[in-house]
């Protein structure tokens, strides 16, 4: 009887020892996504029909069909800038992507078209011919970063959030304060 209990205890100990591993866990650092900026410049002296066609061709070529990811920096003549902004808005470029700088009454106009490109990280393959210990510890984060870099609409968003302003939480505390003081609707 005791021999059977000892055999069961040894089997239980061996199975529990296999579940607990003292080997260090190596966590691979996340692979960064690199964002590259590409700029092209167009200078216009007037806004005749030929210049307007040059502007439209320039915007189409610079955007590569992705007008929502094209950022324009327009400087120079305020009258020509207004015409260029109007043409860009008609092409579908968002107002938040058009920036006016150094407006004056001089004769020429400078339009800089900026496009951002995300360069996805190079990940090792999850399928391997050799089944070693690292095969089961492949980093999932690298493939997630790769997919994000490939699918993101405007890679400039990876550089930082320019729409949400940082705050100290005072606005978020207003509903809690209202609830605690019972001055809101349904207060007792």
Swiss-Prot record:
PROSITE patterns: PROKAR_LIPOPROTEIN (PS51257). A lipid is attached at residue 19 (S-diacylglycerol cysteine). It comes from Sinorhizobium fredii (strain NBRC 101917 / NGR234). A lipid is attached at residue 19 (N-palmitoyl cysteine). One of its GO terms (cellular component) is plasma membrane. This is Uncharacterized lipoprotein y4xK. It is found in: Cell membrane. It comes from the Bacteria. InterPro entries: Pilus_biogenesis_CpaD-related, Pilus_CpaD. Residues 1-18 form the signal peptide. It is a lipid-anchor. Keywords: Cell membrane, Lipoprotein, Membrane, Palmitate, Plasmid, Signal.
